[in-house]
Amino acid sequence: MSELSNIKTLEELFEYWKTKQSNDSGKETCNSENGYVVATNSFYKDGIVNPEEYQNSALKVLFITNEVSIDCKNDVDEKNPELKGNGKGGHLVGNNKGNTVCSFNRYISDDEQETWSGKMRIKFGEMYRIMTEENYKTKDSIDAKANKEALKKIAFMNLNKRGGFGSIQRDVFLNYLKKYKECIRKEIELIAPDVIVWCACNTYDAEEYMGAIFEEKVWKEKKLTLKKGKVPILRMWHPSVQ
């Protein structure tokens, strides 16, 4: 029996996943660029933004993107000696206590401005409203309040929990997906969405990477079979695309 079969919550999964990552050499699964190497124990939690709102929402939507873009100026070993890995004479980067759900909630509560590439959080809120509001109409200006209310009802996950440098390093990313595919599947199962929005049209070969996680027929049918039944997968442009 898989160790994952006994895991019942996202928090339990993330602890298991992070420990497994930390014990991985990272040789084939950690991004590196310009003297920076992603730490093996770098881990950005994600998941359900507001569990109560999500469970009570008319449509449970999970947005999936590839990986966090690491801030190498601030999330670096010089400022965080707890980062582990092989810096290869350069610097380890990442965040061993990262949490994108906290970032969503800081934005919702006006404690943080929208600084994500392409105004991602704004666009996720807009996407959710387009999918769920019967009389939704595009306006010249964004309804920030309505969008923030919408964000409370979504779930969000990155596939590569370590993070990267803003553009996919194909081989490393593919190796990561293959190595941690059971964890990725488990997270989706625990989130239990009604619809998956795969934000991938312009960032990587979705068919290849989808195939590394799921059986080929899943992508061809555009439906993922969970305990609750078949869940449709919508493929959209990544929110950072202008």
Residue ranges and their predicted role:
Residues 2-191, 195, 201:
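A polyanion-binding, active-site-adjacent surface
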